[in-house]
A protein has these predicted regions:
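N-terminal compositionally biased, intrinsically disordered segments and leader/signal-like regions
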Residues: 14, 182, 668, 880-883
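Bacterial N-terminal signal peptides
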Residues: 6-20
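Beta-propeller blade termini and top-face loops
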Residues: 25-798, 805-806, 841, 851, ...
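Contiguous beta-strand segments within globular domains
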Residues: 785-825, 829
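Positively charged n-region of N-terminal signal peptides that target proteins for export
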Residues: 1-4
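Glycine-centered tight-turn motifs at strand-turn-strand junctions
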Residues: 631, 685, 835-892
Length: 892
């Protein structure tokens, strides 16, 4: 360790912008702390899906909101400002939230979204906070998958019940209703039907905590379809606080089979109970007759029931909605959530749409039990708050966008592209060039306002890929938000107009996979050839190619899938739901070798890997060569190496086949031999891999995204280490490297786009560097940007992104921490040797300590980021400690 000494690092500007050479990976560092000072930054866009909400009676400005896969946010000023309070936890999907009525500091969070669809994340149990969300502790139930409701005894906060649906990808014992009487130290499964049935809803009598109702739901979902309903589903009641339960049958209730159930007990009159019950609407299923109806009501505490409404608007797509809430001061006033937002004022007999809706795709609602005018609704657009019983709403969008893919162009500064759930394809800047005024100051970067993002055609679930030669042309796709299978457009940024160029225009709404001409998946691939930017590939069950801008398409493959017709049937169970999402037997990934034209890889969502070496004339199935690969996985990503024509990497996702282990492989001989490369990725409920990417500078340096994080390998996948740093634990669906700026861009499915600025420390981190006492990494090129006019925008926006700091970034490595009086000094000189600037770095302050006054750069410890307005430079052992750098750089 350096003690009482000043480390002096000399830099000449003539070397400042030297290009980093290609280097080969060597012995990896064993401690991620080495590069922990490299920080990600969020850039946008506005987010969407929320799934849980609660307020606190008597505290009108306090709300907690749970995102579908973006963690928990809290506001204490009625929704003006929001703070993420769950990012330190290894899970981001929130299924339920509850605050103890006897102690508002006690908050419980059940993880795992329970609104079932193909692209949702699972949880890792239940968490508790004793300080109003400042800190959290995992309290068990790790394998329950999805906890859709948590109920706390109003008088005894240590008594908690959890409604566990299960992961729903196969049978499991960790389903049903669980209860703790000791604050989560131990749990008892108090209601269990079978391993195919879980809890869909749970309700407590507001006046008697011993009386409980539970909806149990038999459901299973796979890549190829969803089955809702069965003998396990039903409505249950307990009169002893959940210790024992009785199935409620007959007495006016629908006969089985039934599916998802939601239940609520009125506060003003606890004899009034409402149950939303999924039926088959009279359509036979598996040869069995089904009943019709939507809403049942009991006026005697659940003893007898009557069907009061059969309007499908109440529950819409049952697996995705089926929720209700009763006004605390009127047992006849009930709210229902689906794509619409409806209300009854006469006990369920008639429905009325609200004069102003909270949004679309509504999922959950909280009404203040002491004030029926105060309410909050979470939906696919964020959270909406009303203080006048729903006559008007304040709509809030949080930084929780669910992004499917990310691509980048090569402009200066570059733009980022991708598709957002419940939105179109988007384009936004990595740097909005607004350094001052709007949310920022001086040379510190400023914010990226939501208004600088705009749609580029496409839809929620696909790709947005710029032409590498003409970045004004963007190929956008997405079957979501529409009924056309394989929907694709060619967007021109110059006039912001798009032209539809899909392979085959076909309305697939309501059609099973076996009925359509081309089986385009919800997120079918678009790949532009690295050898010819006019050649664009897409995948159905075939690989299609265009060379004339989408005017015509040719098939260059046979059906590359298993084509198992038994797994191409109607999806949904009691309520059919066919919109192209659960289409199996589709090409899910396409990659052409950057090294050798005509070498094209294709992966399917029924578990096959195929290769052609002659541009599609002949194909070889190399799946059998992959060791220990189960069947029916989704080949989610193929990365063809830029270094060797025969080398490729794949990730295979099995989570919808009830296997959440990570699967990643490498081949170096065109698929003849494969090697598993997952050592170091921990096995958990959230281990499954989505994407693998090769570094364009350093051979053997790889990046891999899983359902709850990012990993890096310095040795070609032999070992993996976390690269999480400041990144929330949202699913990392896609990865891109911007080569000019050496930036790593991520598409997170729950927290939007994130960028790790400047990968050069990782690209240059070798065993020799780690053995040295100190090392200065060759900096990347810096640009002197001029600020642009600021758009009209509110000063504070929780969904606004963050610009990179202004100026050059200097990264250095220290083997040991500096002592209290030690300093590291960076001396910058010009080509003649004249010193133009010196920057002194002090030891990093303890976490939570206030920064010392003085100039410096806006970076973390051990890294230098530009501008004379920078904060003090700090350094500690490891890579990425930052010091302020000069504004020298190339004009742009």
């Amino acid at each position: 360790m350096l003690k009482r000494a000043c480390l002096v690092l000399f830099i000449k500007t003539g070397l400042l912008f030297g290009a980093a050479p290609f280097v080969r990976a060597q012995q990896p560092p064993t401690n991620p702390e080495v590069y922990s000072q490299l920080q990600f930054r969020y850039i946008g866009p506005v987010g969407n899906r929320t799934t849980a909400v609660t307020g606190v009676p008597g505290q009108p400005y306090l709300y907690y909101v749970g995102a579908a896969s973006g963690g928990i946010f809290k506001t204490t000023d009625g929704g003006i400002h929001w703070e993420p309070i769950f990012d330190a936890q290894p899970v981001s999907s929130i299924g339920s939230l509850a605050v103890a009525g006897s102690d508002a500091n006690v908050v419980w969070a059940g993880t795992g979204e329970s609104f079932i669809r193909s692209h949702i994340s699972v949880g890792s149990g239940i968490y508790r906070s004793l300080d109003a969300g400042k800190t959290w502790t995992a309290m068990g139930l790790e394998k329950t998958g999805r906890i859709g409701n948590v109920i706390i005894d109003p008088h005894h906060p240590e008594i908690v019940l959890a409604c566990a649906l299960g992961h729903a990808y196969g049978p499991q014992p960790e389903r049903g209703v669980f209860r703790t009487t000791d604050g989560g130290k131990s749990w008892e499964r108090v209601l269990f039907v079978n391993e195919k049935t879980g809890c869909s809803d749970l309700a407590m009598d507001p006046g008697n905590p011993h009386i409980l109702f539970a909806g149990m739901w038999q459901v299973e979902i796979h890549t190829y379809g969803r089955t809702s309903g069965g003998p396990g589903s039903g409505l249950f009641k307990s009169t002893d606080g959940g210790a024992t339960w009785k199935r409620l049958e007959d007495h006016g209730l629908p006969k089985p089979p039934v599916g998802r159930i939601a239940v609520r007990v009125a506060q003003r009159d606890s004899e009034r109970v409402y149950a939303l019950i999924e039926t088959g609407d009279g359509v036979p299923i598996d040869g069995k007759t089904t009943q019709s109806g939507q809403l049942w009501r009991s006026d005697d505490g659940g003893e007898n029931w009557q069907l009061v409404n059969s309007d499908r608007q109440i529950r819409g797509r049952t697996h995705y909605y089926t929720r209700e809430e009763i006004a605390p001061d009127n047992e006849n006033e009930v709210y229902f959530f689906s794509a619409a937002f409806s209300r009854t004022l006469d006990g369920g007999h008639t429905l009325t749409n609200m004069p102003a809706g909270p949004g679309g795709d509504n999922h959950e609602m909280w009404i203040d039990p002491t004030n029926g005018d105060r309410m909050a609704v979470v939906n696919d657009g964020g959270v909406s708050i009303s203080v006048n019983r729903g006559h008007t709403w304040d709509h809030v969008q949080l930084p929780i966008a669910q992004i499917y893919h990310v691509t980048v162009d090569d402009q200066i500064p570059y733009f980022v592209y991708g598709n957002k759930q419940d939105g179109p394809s988007y384009r936004g800047p990595s740097n909005s060039l607004q350094f001052a005024g709007f949310g920022g100051g001086g040379g510190g970067g400023g914010q990226i306002p939501r208004s600088v993002w705009h749609p580029v055609a496409g839809s929620e679930s696909g790709f947005a890929t710029p032409d590498p030669v003409d970045n004004n042309i963007i190929w956008s796709s997405g079957t979501g938000s529409g009924s056309v299978g394989g929907a694709m457009a060619r967007f021109d940024e110059r006039n912001r107009q798009a032209r539809d160029v899909e392979v085959w225009p076909e309305d697939v709404s309501g059609a099973s996979a076996v009925e359509v001409k081309y089986r385009f998946n919800w997120e079918f691939p678009i790949t532009i050839s690295p050898h010819d930017h006019n050649k664009v590939y897409v995948g159905s069950q075939y690989v299609h190619v265009t060379t004339d801008g989408g005017n015509s398409w040719q098939m260059i493959s046979p059906d590359l899938t298993r084509n198992d017709k038994s797994r191409q049937q109607i999806s949904g169970g009691l309520t059919p739901d066919n919109i192209g999402v659960e289409y199996a037997g589709t090409v899910f990934a396409i990659a052409e070798s950057p090294k050798e034209a005509g070498v094209i890889w294709a992966g399917t969502n029924d578990g096959l890997v195929q290769i052609t070496r002659d541009g599609g004339k002949s194909w070889s199935d190399v799946t059998k060569n992959i060791p220990n690969l189960p069947e029916w996985g989704t080949v989610s990503n193929i990365e063809a190496s830029r270094y060797d024509a025969g080398t490729a990497y794949i990730t295979v996702d099995f989570h919808q086949m009830d296997n959440r282990d990570p699967f990643a492989y490498e081949t170096r001989d065109y698929g003849r031999v494969w090697t598993a490369i997952t050592k170091g990725i921990p096995h958990s409920m959230l281990s499954y891999a989505h994407c693998i990417r090769e570094d364009p500078v350093r051979k053997g340096l790889l990046y891999l995204g899983t359902e709850n994080g990012l990993y890096v390998s310095f040795d070609d996948g032999k070992n993996w280490q976390p690269l999480q740093n400041s990144l929330p634990h949202a699913p990392v669906y896609w990865i891109a490297v911007q080569e000019r700026f050496h930036d790593l861009a991520l598409a997170t499915y729950g927290r939007g786009f994130w960028i790790l600025d400047d990968l050069t420390p990782l690209q240059q981190l070798t065993a020799e560097v780690l053995a040295s006492n100190a090392h200065l990494f060759a900096p990347r090129a810096a640009y002197r940007f001029r600020p642009v006019a600021q758009p009209a925008a509110v000063f504070y926006d929780p969904a606004a992104g963050h610009n990179p700091p202004f100026g050059a970034v200097l990264n250095f490595y220290l083997k040991a921490n500096l002592g209290e009086k030690d300093r590291a000094r960076l001396t910058i000189s010009d080509a003649s040797g004249k010193v133009v600037r010196e920057i002194e770095c002090r030891p990093a302050r303890p976490e939570g300590a206030r920064p010392a006054a003085g100039p410096g750069g806006p970076g973390g410890a051990g890294r230098g980021e530009g501008g004379p307005d920078a904060r003090p430079c700090e350094a500690k052992a490891g890579t990425g400690g930052t010091c302020g750098a000069s504004r020298a750089g190339r004009s742009s």
